[in-house]
Amino acid sequence: MTQTTNGSYGLGDFVLQSGIVLSNAFIGYQTYGALNSRRDNVIVFPTWYTGTNGQVAPYVAKGKALDPEKYFIVIPDMFTNGSSTSPSNAADPHRDLDFPLVTPFDNVIAQRRLLEEYFNVTGIELMAGFSMSGQLAYHWAALHSDLVKRACSICGTAKTSPHNWAMLHAYKSTMEASPNWLNSACSEWDPKILTIVSSIGATMAMSQDWYRQGQHLSGDIIDVASAIENLKSLFASWVPANLYAQTLTWMAADVSDNSTFNGDLAAALAAIKIPFLMMPCNTDLYFRVADNEAEIPYMSNATLTVIESSSGHMAGLPGFSSDDDAFVNEQLLKLLRIPSIN
């Protein structure tokens, strides 16, 4: 039986990139497998927008890239997802809408502390991520290559694109439009706001082709309206203030926005020397193939492999499509076979 653990690690007073201190911060995690004697047989796969650590499970199995009999697999929870420090559980004065911006940079610092301070990890064979955690892969590769040997971004980019930012602004402004947003609506969903947020998600997460093919129809889901109703359950499970804070994190994603690169995106991409795999989906409406194509000329050791699928952004979501999962797994296996440079 595969060894698994769930837990959280206390980070103490965690200084954010902004200089604001999160008191008694903590990071949640799930692990599979066991560390070897060198403590370097590690794969890291953080959570994503609306993701929690248990959702990576479809990628984890004997013989797969994320093989718990071969690797120690760590699934860190991103700040704001409810399992790590978030608006809903933060210490005063950072509860609810007083929660400060937490950047991808901050998340990676916290994840590295978890790995080194708690698990005493000495090396990472692969850092992979989907969507928002695919954006974290760029941060790991550009800023922490002393620890990580390979990285993969599945349906992600080094910086949130203008169109992606505009979509996120739709989520943000919709939540802010709730009549009681500054009071109870940040902790409990206004039904009308929940419907609008779910409609935005249904519009953007899957492609036009996916709907045209009738992929949304199954069981009680007989039309697009009932598909949106079904998606409500995902968003309803989130505290609105947590989703709001996670939206701000996604909007702020930029691998060059730190004191190392000072906003020079080309320099940040050029700093990625380890084997790096970009895996966009050809029908993704969030992260376009063209966005990755624009990045790759600056990177000396990167490969771009396209997921050909009608699933849109969900092509990279573990468990959404068995065909997409199989393709992603095969590409990760190939990446793991590439010799490391460090």
Summary of predicted features, one role per range:
Residues R39-T50:
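Short beta-strand element of the alpha/beta-hydrolase
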Residues L147-K149, S153-S233:
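Alpha/beta-hydrolase-fold enzymes
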Residues E293-P297, N301-N342:
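Catalytic active-site module of serine/aspartate enzymes centered on a nucleophile-bearing elbow/loop
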Residues L22, T50-L136, A142, D146-L168, ...:
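Gly/Pro-rich cap/lid or specificity-loop segments adjacent to the active site
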